[in-house]
Amino acid sequence: ATEDMRRRFAKIFGEEDAKRLEFRTINGISQKVLQYFAYRTQKTPFQVADKEASTAVKQSFLEVTGKYATENDIKETQLEITYAKNMRLTPEEIRNMDTEVEKFPEIFRTYNAKLRQMQMIDYDDQMIYALRILEQYPGVLAYFREKYQYFCVDEAQDTSKIQHDMMDLLAAKSRNLFMVGDEDQSIYGF
């Protein structure tokens, strides 16, 4: 996605201008925030679970329901986990979610506990932790506001609440936020 955006920009404005800019996904910015915070606090950066996250979903599903998850169960559970995290749902809101996933609140808790046991985070957690750091550490927020003064979000209709909150926070000082999207294609409803 970022390389495609860079190529499109270079085609219109030229390669020299494209080289002076950074093109990142919101997850890419989140990763930079976590790396910078780890460097500043001299802590080990978080490990992001990839295949481990899928394994944790399967194990959590089996542990909570007593059933082996089908491919559809895994897909649906992962989608619900992503939705809950990206919409910044509270535990009560998760308990009250309208979902087809049997015992989802318990699976959600078990899944997150398994990630903690492995000392890992998933890609959704990466955004959650990055936003918390930006909200709670003014020096880190100031650094990223200085580093990134202009924001263009493509496919803005697909941004989640947490992604929207992060962009709002980063661009709050400069007010240089440009979002492009098609509301008829929105996957979130806020």
What are these regions (language model features)?
Residues A1-K43, A142, K161, Q185-I187:
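P-loop NTPase Walker
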Residues A18-R20, Y39-D124, Y148:
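ATP-hydrolysis module of ASCE/P-loop NTPase motor domains
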Residues I26-I29, T77-Y83, Y129-A130, K147, ...:
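Short acidic/histidine-centered micro-motifs embedded in hydrophobic/aromatic stretches
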Residues A49-A53, T99-F190:
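Conserved helicase NTPase motor core
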